[in-house]
């Protein structure tokens, strides 16, 4: 008589394929996952509570450490929320610098996802190529703000520093280079039969399920939902650029891959246009008081980060610190669908599905 029993398996919290301190407790019967339970909180630092005792400018460095792979968009969302409350008009040159910084950051973030996701499923070379190009972007951002990862570049009213001499020209030269490398990525990976067998038909969910789980970003668009805040609710100067939003149709790991790869191409279009339209001169910071006090009231803003919709809610009582601060962190919401995706899957697909969701634990835990 054959007898089977379920086995409890811990993935993490230090497993290399979780890309952070994330633990996944799974029950398996043979090689089939019966249940998956994410365990989070290992990187929780209480950012929102700490912010209640900080001035608005002091909060910006804390946002760098949420989604640390896309710190510029985190910088922007807190500044945008305060600027909305204060009714500030941002200098045009500062807006272009912000867009350039955010879109370069988006490309760098997707490169990390591409390289590490493929490394997890056994392809080593793409990881090396991805980090080669990412290093070029990091060097550009380092020249702009003096930091490689946690930038603290944006300010309420604009940005901290203007671009150094020759920086715009370097960004302009990077665009055609990156396009050429991107074509090489597709030649290397996108048509590879082994890779396609690992991602096609794996981790499928519908548009209705994506919406019910509050998914956003590529995790939503892979199901065919055409929704991107840069297009649908334009902020900053995104309405000045010509670009389209990549969408999928099936909602599997392959569609998520295609959406993110095409997003790199669209970000390059935005960067190219921003360089062409970049103002020759002008201020990079609006006239704001040294001690910023948001007027009494509430504001909620949301923008499109590489992982989806990141939002910032501020309740102010008129003081120099927020009365309440709340972030909508897309990685936290995107993670919620993971147990549903893993149930009934072969354990070999676990890392493929987890990598396709593309979470950052600093953002999940907050």
UniProtKB/Swiss-Prot annotation:
It comes from the Bacteria. Pfam families: Complex1_49kDa. It is a peripheral membrane protein. It catalyses: a quinone + NADH + 5 H(+)(in) = a quinol + NAD(+) + 4 H(+)(out). GO terms for cellular component: plasma membrane. The keyword Cell membrane applies. The keyword Transcription does not apply. Keywords: Cell membrane, Membrane, NAD, Quinone, Translocase, Transport. InterPro entries: NADH_Q_OxRdtase_suD, NDH1_su_D/H, NiFe-Hase_large. GO terms for molecular function: NAD binding; NADH:ubiquinone reductase (non-electrogenic) activity; quinone binding. It is found in: Cell membrane. Its EC number is 7.1.1.-. Transmembrane segments: none annotated. Its main location: membrane. NDH-1 shuttles electrons from NADH, via FMN and iron-sulfur (Fe-S) centers, to quinones in the respiratory chain. The immediate electron acceptor for the enzyme in this species is believed to be a menaquinone. Couples the redox reaction to proton translocation (for every two electrons transferred, four hydrogen ions are translocated across the cytoplasmic membrane), and thus conserves the redox energy in a proton gradient. NCBIfam families: PRK06075.1, PRK12322.1. Belongs to the complex I 49 kDa subunit family. NDH-1 is composed of 14 different subunits. Subunits NuoB, C, D, E, F, and G constitute the peripheral sector of the complex. This is NADH-quinone oxidoreductase subunit D. It comes from Bacillus thuringiensis subsp. konkukian (strain 97-27).
């Amino acid at each position: 008589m054959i007898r089977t029993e379920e086995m409890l398996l811990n993935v993490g919290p230090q497993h290399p394929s979780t890309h952070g301190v994330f633990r996944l407790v799974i029950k398996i019967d043979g090689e089939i996952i019966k249940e998956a339970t994410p365990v989070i909180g290992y990187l929780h630092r209480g950012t929102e509570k700490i912010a209640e005792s900080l001035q608005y400018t002091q909060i910006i460095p804390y946002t760098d450490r949420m989604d640390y792979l896309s710190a510029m968009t985190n910088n922007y969302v807190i500044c945008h929320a305060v600027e909305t409350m204060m009714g500030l008009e941002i200098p045009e040159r500062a807006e272009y610098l912000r867009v350039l910084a955010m879109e370069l950051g988006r490309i760098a973030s997707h490169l990390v996802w591409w390289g590490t996701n493929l490394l997890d499923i056994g392809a080593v070379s793409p990881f090396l190529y991805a980090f080669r190009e990412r290093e070029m972007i990091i060097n550009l951002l380092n020249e702009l703000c003096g930091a490689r990862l946690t930038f603290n570049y944006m300010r309420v009213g604009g940005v901290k520093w203007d671009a150094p001499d020759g920086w715009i020209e370097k960004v302009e030269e990077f665009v055609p280079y990156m396009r050429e490398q991107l074509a090489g990525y597709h030649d290397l990976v996108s048509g590879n039969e082994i890779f396609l067998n690992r991602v096609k038909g794996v981790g499928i969910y519908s548009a209705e399920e994506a919406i019910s789980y509050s998914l956003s970003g590529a995790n939503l668009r892979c199901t065919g939902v055409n929704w991107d805040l840069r297009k649908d609710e334009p902020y900053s100067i995104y309405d000045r650029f010509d670009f389209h939003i990549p969408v999928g149709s099936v909602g599997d790991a392959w569609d998520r891959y295609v959406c993110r790869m095409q997003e790199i191409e669209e970000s390059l279009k935005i960067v190219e246009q921003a360089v062409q339209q970049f103002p020759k001169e002008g201020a990079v910071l609006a006239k704001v008081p040294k001690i910023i006090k948001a007027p009494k009231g509430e504001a909620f803003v949301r923008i499109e980060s590489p992982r989806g919709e990141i939002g910032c809610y501020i309740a102010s009582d008129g003081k120099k610190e927020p009365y309440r601060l709340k972030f909508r962190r897309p990685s936290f919401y995107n993670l919620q669908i993971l147990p549903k995706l893993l149930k009934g899957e072969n354990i070999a697909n676990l890392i493929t599905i987890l990598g396709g969701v593309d979470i950052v634990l600093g953002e999940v835990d907050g």
